[in-house]
């Protein structure tokens, strides 16, 4: 699927955007981002009345809208205000934004362990939703096609289908399955802001607000307060998008090793279809005739798999990716959870993404 051919967002999002007369604006952000535009004045749109009303409507429809943050307020408390007052309240937040502390709770996992979940206040959730609505189309235009977590019209089923395609059609039977150690707790804030800047998100006021969100104090169940210097808490409205921004660089690094390698500066590999799109079939044919080693990535949030041809290539990929994550993203892997698997012997354990459904439910705040 080419970037320019990606599906539009879910119908519910489209309905909200159309109702608040924002769809054309969001479509323009996507189109401009595809063309490489730099965005330096996003706060005007983020803090606009229409965007705030749409964010309020979206948060109100979430199952977690009745869950209180540290201030004990829920969407029912904001519902007591008329539209003019809650819009003014959110706009006031943007003028000098300092988020309230995030309440941390432990959500049980099927294996008996727990997952830490950060619950911002209801006002901070609406602020984050306002930012998300504007940043998402800009980032979607930059994201790699085979990243499937927390994105419009993508799911675990799509990730599994892509894995099956690489196995059954491309005959790539070796998988490098890498687990990033405590990914959400170890995101480097400086690197993340730099990645957003390189994506064209260069509104300095907005980037300062996002820094404030990332540094929001965390209140534990025992009353202890943490002041994070890294990480993005699971449970934040903006956290899934930010995690995809961080790992998008990994996606494109892997893609540049084979899948998109011809796109980088060599015109002889490029041939256009009748409609003007790039003929990928022609490029793949040339690649297969070369001495290059095929490698593909399929990613769902921080869970990703690398597909290659044989054992030697797999272990080289394992070592190179581990080093790249450490040097480029300041992230470590979990050796005990990371492995190289021969799918002819162990198919199901390495291709299943069904355990990721837990992420989809707990993040609906």
Placement of each model-derived feature along the sequence:
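N-terminal mitochondrial targeting presequence
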Residues: 1-2
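Short, ordered, surface-exposed loop/turn motifs in non-cytosolic proteins
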Residues: 364-365
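Short, solvent-exposed coil/turn linker segments
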Residues: 71-77, 339-342, 361
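A generic structural signal for alpha-helix starts
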Residues: 126, 312-313, 360
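Conserved pre-catalytic core of RNA-dependent polymerases
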Residues: 7, 17-237
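Conserved small/polar residues in nucleotide/adenosyl-binding loops
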Residues: 354-361
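Basic Arg/Gly/Lys-rich low-complexity intrinsically disordered segments
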Residues: 12
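Conserved polymerase palm-domain catalytic core
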Residues: 94, 101, 142-146, 151, ...
């Amino acid at each position: 699927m080419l970037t320019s051919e990606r599906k539009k967002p879910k119908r519910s999002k489209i309905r909200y955007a159309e109702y608040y007369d924002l769809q054309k604006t969001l479509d323009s952000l996507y189109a401009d981002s595809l063309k490489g535009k730099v965005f330096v004045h996003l706060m005007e749109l983020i803090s606009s009345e229409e965007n705030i009303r749409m964010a309020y409507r979206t948060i109100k429809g979430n199952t977690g809208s009745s869950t209180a943050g540290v201030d004990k307020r829920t969407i029912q408390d904001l519902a007591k205000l008329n539209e003019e007052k809650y819009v003014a309240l959110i706009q006031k937040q943007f003028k000098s934004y300092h988020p309230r502390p995030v309440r941390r709770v432990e959500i049980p996992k099927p294996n008996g362990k727990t997952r830490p979940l950060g619950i911002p206040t209801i006002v901070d959730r609406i602020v984050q939703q306002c930012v998300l609505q504007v940043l998402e189309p800009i980032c979607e235009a930059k994201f790699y096609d085979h990243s499937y977590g927390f994105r419009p019209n993508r799911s675990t089923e799509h990730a599994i289908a892509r894995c099956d395609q690489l196995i059954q059609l491309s005959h790539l039977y070796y998988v490098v399955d890498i687990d990033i150690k405590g990914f959400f707790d170890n995101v480097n804030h400086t690197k993340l802001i730099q990645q957003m800047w390189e994506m064209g998100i260069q509104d300095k006021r907005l980037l300062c607000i996002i820094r404030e969100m990332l540094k929001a104090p965390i209140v534990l169940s025992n009353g202890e307060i943490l002041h994070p210097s890294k990480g993005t808490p699971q449970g934040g409205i903006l956290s899934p998008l930010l995690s995809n921004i961080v790992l998008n660089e990994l996606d494109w690094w892997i893609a540049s090793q084979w899948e998109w390698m011809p796109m980088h500066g060599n015109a002889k590999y490029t041939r256009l279809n009748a409609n003007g799109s790039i003929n990928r079939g022609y490029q793949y044919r040339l690649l297969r005739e070369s001495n290059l080693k095929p490698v593909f990535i399929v990613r769902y949030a921080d869970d990703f798999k690398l597909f290659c041809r044989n054992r030697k290539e797999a272990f080289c990929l394992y070592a190179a990716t581990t080093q790249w994550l450490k040097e480029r993203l300041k992230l470590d892997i979990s050796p005990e959870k990371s492995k190289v698997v021969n799918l002819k012997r162990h198919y199901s354990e390495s291709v299943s993404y069904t355990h990721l459904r837990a992420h989809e439910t707990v993040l609906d705040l």
